[in-house]
UniProtKB/Swiss-Prot annotation:
Family in the record: Belongs to the elongation factor P family.
Gene this protein is translated from: efp
UniProt key word Chloroplast: no
Top-level taxon of the source organism: Bacteria
Functional summary from the UniProt entry: Involved in peptide bond synthesis. Stimulates efficient translation and peptide-bond synthesis on native or reconstituted 70S ribosomes in vitro. Probably functions indirectly by altering the affinity of the ribosome for aminoacyl-tRNA, thus increasing their reactivity as acceptors for peptidyl transferase.
Name assigned to this protein: Elongation factor P
Length: 189
């Protein structure tokens, strides 16, 4: 059992016998009212999203999820097929099931992901916190602009855009932090 104040992004709770992923949790305490937790939840089985406000003392059921290592095997339209690295079983997910990691999923990637199962059904995939991707396009460096941390837009092979350091060029391998939508960490070593 969890209480409302223990909710944080990534936590999975049970509501009406379905697993719900906490995507956002905002704790609020005012002088007059009791503490509350405003949450954005996603049903892991149906993809339905909702917002619910919990009291800090509300009791919520935990969900036991199984996790296995998996790699992306191939992409066919909006269907992504992942392979369990231990027994080579194939599992399919739609693009909407993995929309939070979709900007960093690309054909031929070798990253080992964490496949998340609820009652033997694949419900989502989590990427490692740091991944390496190649810059497909970026503008040239701005000469003389060295007053601070200078960033410029760049595009990855799958079309994802993010800000990178000014010295990054086309073809460079960069590290990306996949938490909170993804951000540039540095040049890959």
């Amino acid at each position: 059992m969890k209480t409302g104040k223990e909710l944080k992004p990534g936590t999975v709770i049970r509501l009406e016998n379905d697993p719900w992923l906490v995507q956002k949790a905002e704790f609020t305490k005012s002088g007059r009212n009791s503490a509350i937790m405003k949450t954005k939840l996603k049903n892991l089985l149906t993809g339905y999203k909702t917002e619910i406000v919990y009291s800090a003392d509300d009791k919520l059921d935990d969900v036991i999820l199984d996790r296995k290592e998996a790699t992306l095997s191939f992409i066919s339209g909006d269907t992504y097929t992942f392979m369990d690295t231990s027994d080579y079983t194939m599992y399919e997910l739609n693009a909407e099931d993995i929309e939070s990691v979709l900007p960093f999923v690309e054909e031929g990637m070798t990253d080992v992901c964490e496949a998340v199962f609820f009652e033997d059904r694949l419900v989502s995939v989590e990427l490692p916190t740091t991944i390496v991707r190649q810059v497909d396009y970026t503008e040239g460096s701005a000469r003389g602009d060295t007053s601070g941390k200078v960033m410029k837009p760049a595009k990855l092979k799958n079309g994802t855009e993010l800000s990178v350091a000014d010295f990054i060029e086309i073809g460079d391998m960069i590290e990306i932090d996949t938490r909170e939508g993804g951000s540039y960490k540095g040049r890959a070593k």
